[in-house]
Structure formats: C-alpha cells, structure tokens
Amino acid sequence: MPLQSLVKALWNVLHEEESEGYPDLTELIAEVESYQQRYPKQNPTNSQKIRHILDEIYEKTPFNNTRRRILWLAVLKTVIPLLILDRQAVGEWWDQIFFPFLNSPTQLKPVFSDLKSILFYILIFHDEDEWGGDLRRECAEETITRLVDLYVSKAIENLGDVESQEQRNQTIECLVNVLVHYGIQRPKELSSCFCHHFLNPPTRIPILSVMVEVIRRQGPRLYEIPQTGFYDLVLKCAEFDTSPILLSYALSFILMILSHICNSLDDSLYRLFCIYLRFSMIDPTSGFPSSTASGNWEVFHDFMSTYASTTTSQTDSSYNDVHDIVGSSQPDYLESLDYSQLFSILYALYPINFLEFLRDPKLYASKHNFQIRYSFNQELLSTKSDGLLGRHLAHSNFLKYTAETELTDKSRWTRLDSIAVVALCNSLNAVGIAESVMDPFGGKLPTTYEETSSATGLLAYPNESHDIASEPFSISWPQNPSISGSVHSATTFDKAQLSNTEDSYDNISHGTSYSEGVSSIHMVKGERGSNNLELTSESLSSTNDTIRRLQRDLLFLQNELRFEKFVRQQHLQNIGKLHREHILDMAVESERQKLLLTNKRYKAQIELLNSEIDKHRSESQAALNRRVKWENDFNNKIKALREEKKAWKSEESELKSSIESLISQLESIRNSQIDIAFSKNQLELKLQLYETKLKEYEQHLSCVNISKKQVSSSSDTSFGNTKMDSSMILSNSEAVSDEQERELIESEKHRMKLESENLHLQANIELLKKDLEAINVVYEAKIFDLEKRLSSEANAPELHNPVNLNYDAQLSKISEIKENYDELLTRYRELEGKFLESQAEVEELKNFQKPLVDTGSSIHSSPGLQQSKFIIRNDSLHPKVGPPRRQSTDTSRSTFRQY
C-alpha cells in the first residue's frame, strides 16, 4: 500500500538521522510521488492518518537542535501536498515549527527558504483547489493573522530597540517577503489583517512599508483594497498625522493606488483635495497648518518621539537630546514632502473639479457638502498651485465635460488601465517627465526589467500542477554554521559601509523591508565598538540617537526609492506597451501596404473585368436585340399563323358545312336510289310476272291451238266465249306491257339521272379530299419550317417553349378533332346500317303486300295465277336489296372512308 510505504519512509528518514547524521530524502520523495500517482486528489482519511503519524513522530523525537529542526522542516515540506489542514493543524505547526524558526536570530537562509515554501503553499491557493473552499481559506486566514501579528511586534521592537536590530533583520526579511508576495495575490485579505493594527501609531510605518511594496509590485487585485477600510485609514493618516516619514509613506501609497481605483473614488476625491491643501500649506518653519479635532484618531507625531518612547533604557536627558535632534531636522524632512505628484495625478484624473477647488476651496466645499478641517491662505495656495499648473499641459476634459459631468461619467475609465492612467499623468506633466526617471543618488536606475516583472516560482500565483515536493531540497549541512555579517566580523569600517550599502540597495531593489538597510548602520556601530571598548553611556546614547536619525533618513530614502521604482516601472510598462503598439502599428502598416498592393492588383483586375463586362454587355445587348428581333419575327409569324389558323378554322367550318350539305344531299340521293331500286325491283318483279303470264298465255294459247286442232267441232257458243276471253286477255296483256315499258323507261331515266348526280357528288368529294390533303401538306410544311427555325436558334432558347407549347396545343386540338370526327363517322355508319336494315324490312313488307294486291283479281280468272303467286312469294324470300342498291351503298361507304 502507498500509505504504509510512506509511513515507513518517514520513520526511516528519522532513523538515518540518528544513526548516520546525514539523512537522504530521496526515498521519501519517491514514496510521495507514488502516493500522488495512486491518489491524485487529497484523501481525507489518509491525510488524517499522515497527520497522526507526524504528531507521533514529533512527540517521540526530541527536536532539540537545529539539525533535527531542519530535518523536520524538510520532511514537512515534502509531505505537505498530501495533507488536508485546518485551524488546529495550523496552530500546532505554528507552535512547533513556524514561530521557533522565525523567532530564531541565528537561523540559516536555506531554512527560511523552505519555511517560506511551506507558508506560500498554505497561503496562496486556487479558489478551485481540490480541498479548497472554506477549509483552506480558514487555514490561510489563521496563518496570515499570526504572521501579521509576529511581523508587527518584531517591526516595532526593531524600530524601538536599536541594540538588537541586526538579530531581527533576517526574521523580518523573511516575514516581509512572505507578506509582500501574499499581498500581491491577496491584497484584500492582507489589508484586512492590517486594519486593526494600523490604529496603533507605532505600527503604521511598518505596515505602510509592506503595503507600498505590495502596490509597487502591481498585483492583479489592487482595486479590492478600498473595500476593506484600509484605504480610509491611510487617508486619515494623511489628514491628521504629523510625522514627515509616515506622511511620505502614506503619500506614496495614495499615489500608487489612485491609478487602480480612479473610477471608484466618490467621496474620497474631496478628501484627496483636502490632503493636497494640507500638504501645500506646510511651512518648513511652523510645520503643518492648524486643524480641527481628529476624533478618535490617535495622531502619529514624529518618528523619534514615537519609537524612542518604546525603549526603557533611555533617560530624560537622552530623550531631550533626541528631541533636539528631531527639532533640528524637522524642517529638512518637511521640505522633502513633495506633493507635486499628487497635484499631477489629481489634475490628470479630475482637472475641472480640482482647479475649481483650488480657485475657491470654501465655495467648492459648501457646494459639495464636505468640510475643510485645515486653515489655509488662499494667496499662498494660488501661488504654489500656479507654479505647478504652469508645468502641466492643458487637459482635454476642459472641452468635453463640465464639473458635474466629470464626476458622474465613469465610462471614460473603462478604456484606461492603471498603466494608461500613469502615462496620462506623465504626459500632462511636461517638466517632470525627465526628472521622474532619475535615481535619488544622482545616477540612473538599472535598466533591467526583471525587477518590475511579476514574481515567478513559489512567489507567483500557483498553478494547478504546482507541487511543493518537486522543488529541489535546499537544506545545507555545514560543519560550523555561522551568520555572515555578524557583529564580530573583522572587516574595516569603509569596506563594511560600502558592502552593506550595496547589500541594502540590492535588498531594497528586491522588495524587502526597511530593516534590511539598517544592517549597515549596525555594522558601523560594531566596527566602532570593536575598536573602542571603553565608551561612556553618554556617547552610547548619542550614538543610538545618531543611528535612529540615520535610520529615519534611510526610511525616507527607501520610500523615495520605492516610489521612483514604481514610476520607473510604470514608465517601463508604458514603454513596453508603446513598443507593442508600435510593433502592432508596424504590422498594421505593413498589412496596410500589402492591402494597398492587393487593392491595386484588384483594381487592375477590376478594370480588365470591366472591359470584359462591357464587351459581354455589348454582345449581350446585340444578342438581346437579335432576340427582340426574333421575338418580333416569331410574334408576327405566330400572328400570321393565328390568322391562317382562323382562316383554316373558317375553311374548316365551311368545309364542314359543305360536307354536311353534301351528306344531306347524299342521304337524299341514297333515299332516291333506294326508291329507284325499290321501284326497279317492283318493275322487275312485274316484268317477271308478266313474262310468266306471257309464258302461261303462250302455253295456254298453244294449248288452245292444240285444243282447236283436236276439237274442231266444238259448238259455236263455246267457241264464241273462248274467243271473247282470249281477246280480253290479249287486250289486258298489251295494256299492261305498254304501261310497264313506260315505267321502265322512266325508271331508267331516273336511274341515269341519279347515277350522274352520284358521279358528280363523288367528283366533288374527291376534290374536297384533294383540297384537304393539299391544306394538310401546306400546314405540315409550315410547321416543319417553324420547327427547323426554332431548332436552329440555339441562342434564343426562351422562344422554343412558347412555340412548342403552341404547336403541341394545335396538335392536341387537331388530334381531338380527328378523334371526334372518327367517333361521329363510326356513329354515322352505325346509324346508316340501322337505317338500311329498317329500309330493307320496309321494302320487304311492301314487296310482300303489292303482289297480293295485284294478283288478287286474277286468282279466279285462270289456274296459272296460282303458280305466279307462288313465284312472287319465292321471290320475296330473296335478298332485300338488289345489285344496283348494294353497289350504291358500297360506293357511298367507300367515299366516307376516304373522306
């Protein structure tokens, strides 16, 4: 199990330290890595077990020497990523590790490095940490509260007791380093911890030194500081305190933070105006202007009296000497309070309101309902402000805003960040631009940009993959540990002063506290103490006063240096921003040139395309003209075709009417033919009847002649009767034959007439057929011509559709007419057949009845009439229509089929 292997590795490390003296943490680091691979996130149960094991090890192992404490610190640094801490664990570790190590004056720097790594892991975390949230926030609050309390107490002791300052320098350096880098990531939490300490006057300078360094590092959340009330306390400090060094720190803090909170000043803007009024009314001889009561605010009067009162080894005479020193140096420090930067930033942020306030402060205060607590001279204020105003350029707000709109318009700050605000202030200060980049010692500041960049490694905001155990183990094991730069060093005064001055400058450059530079003063004192062992108490007190005075000078210089570094940092950031903008402008310019060349190329292409478009436009216009011409031609042709169609329709209607008239004539002719055929049949029947009768008569005559020859001697009476009958029969037969001949002649004439008319009608029908065929040929030729023209015109496809549609419509109409005609023709033929059948039946009936009527009178006259009657009945059973009639009907049908 990874947990058991980890516990075993912990015990092995301590066992190796007891036996050999030089433990190896490689095995422990490997076990920690394997445990993290097995449990990527913190396990609460395993974390509790590991904490119990660590408590058991701490209770069983006597950590009574520095080596074991260093080992214990290294072990904690290795296993802390596996733990889930709470307030109780932080309190136990503070009593076991943090406070003893931080309070030890002889501690090694690698120990402080590992200690800071553990503190950074506890303090700085992601909000979305695996075991973050309220639990880790409580641990961070408990730790930072204890660190702030320890730092404040050590700083007050360090400023008050100059004898033991060097022993606390390393501790204060570590505390300041932790607090500064915690404040960079969590400025709101740090300023909240400083609020209740800031009410105590001796703590204000140490607290402001840390906060000024935090703001100088330009963290990401500096705008959260006014939300805690610490900003209000600093404004009160600038309004009521009288210590020049404290006011210089407060002024530096205000100047540095204003660029981050310029959009949320509100009522504090009027307080800033009053602070400027107070600073401008400072007189080097009389001091600060008189003011009203400060309420419950405890005023910090001066540096010497405040921190001299914290020591108990000074006498009244020494305090009077110190007071004399303070009084003699007070004007110099008052003159060093430069408020021109405050004028520049207030003029850059709210120029209209600021100048209106300077014109008449009382009127402006009554207008905006706030109180000015200081007495001031309007002429002196105008004189000093005119000199500062002459160094600045005209602001653009004078053209854009009024006094009211300048206060209410917050949108103008959304386009500016803190670097842009500082750049705006510097751009308006035409005279102070060159002066602000110079070093206070007369030279230029270093040109490296590494100091102004954000902290890296553990000092930076930890990322998700941050692992404190993966850092190199920084513990060294010297045989004879010692502290460099101690009071017993054998260096000379000049070398010590030079080296410690350089060390102080380097340490200040990296953001340490004011106590780092004091080591040079103590080095001087150590050198003098080693050379002069018989100093009196009076000389020692005067030396302490001198050291405190030099310490105050050093604090002034440190504050000025921090502010100059801040200005330099802002300049460098602005230069970097301008350089980036310049690079961007160059890129934009190159892109613009490229776009111009591309634009020119595109213009040439556009001109070429325009010429081609004009050419195509002219061609399309010509094609359009041709199309219009073709459309007109086709429209004219279509109109002509429509006219022809109308003529064809009229001709068709005329032909239909003529056909109908011909059909009616044909019907009448057919009827007459039927009648003629019927009469012909009747005549033929009569002729046959007469022929039979004639034959009978001839037979009868032959019989009579024979009978005459045989019976020659018949009586006269019978002979007379027979002769009378034969004469009657002959007379009747002759009359009948004459009448039949006349009827035959008339019927033959009528038949010839009908045949001639039939031939004439057939000729007319043939002519009509030929005309129709000729018309169809002409129409088809025209249609073929139109189709050929339409197919040849490929550039005018829009004409095909209407012509094709018209052609299809005409064809559909013609096919429909033909179908209707075929239907009518079939119906006509059916009706004609039915009519002929009915006519045949009628003729049959007539033929059957007429012989009966004609022969009824001759039945009783002679026996031969019975035979003729039988013949007539047999003839009636023959086909109804004779050959002439069948021929006429066939010809009429053939003519209709051809039509």
From Swiss-Prot:
Protein name in the entry: Tuberous sclerosis 1 protein homolog
Coiled-coil residue spans: 540-706, 737-847
Name of a matching Pfam family: Hamartin
Sequence segments annotated as region (Disordered): 874-899
Composition-biased stretches (Polar residues): 889-899
Gene Ontology CC annotation, any one: cytoplasm
Assembly information from the UniProt record: Interacts with tsc2.
Task performed by this protein: Together with tsc2, required for uptake of various amino acids from the environment and for proper conjugation. Involved in induction of gene expression of permeases and genes required for meiosis upon nitrogen starvation. May act as a GTPase-activating protein (GAP) for the small GTPase rhb1.
Main location: cytoplasm
Alphabetical GO biological process terms: negative regulation of G1/S transition of mitotic cell cycle; negative regulation of TOR signaling; negative regulation of TORC1 signaling; positive regulation of L-arginine import across plasma membrane; positive regulation of L-leucine import across plasma membrane; positive regulation of L-methionine import across plasma membrane; regulation of cell cycle
Subcellular location: Cytoplasm
Superkingdom of the source species: Eukaryota
GO molecular-function term, one example from the UniProt record: GTPase activator activity
Key words, A-Z: Coiled coil, Cytoplasm
